[in-house]
Amino acid sequence: MRFLPTLTLSLLLTLAPSLARTEEVKVLVQSSPLAGSQYYALSSVWGDIRPGDKLLLKREPENRHDANAVRVEWNGHQLGYVPRAENRALAAAMDRGDKVEARGARMKRHRNPWQRVEFEVYVIL
């Protein structure tokens, strides 16, 4: 009667993650400035976007300037990109299907567009 213990173990292993985890665990993996904001919609949504707002990350593997490009959007508005110097690991994680999330962290009016918005990227476990 090895079938029952094997079946029970299989069932527990299948159900354990959903039983043990009632909420998602988010791990901060990256904090970056927003690249290219001067070319996109940031100025038109500046008064509406707030620190803590959820940002959408979209991979652009066919981007002619950067095969690791990750676009950053807020409510359907493209704000810019994850900086090229910081996007390789994030692009690889997204390509693997890892769950990631981004949120605006800090915003300030500044002449230098690289200092206007900082955002954080989390991996969801």
PLM segments and residue spans:
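Conserved active-site motif detector
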Residues: R2-L11, S18-L125
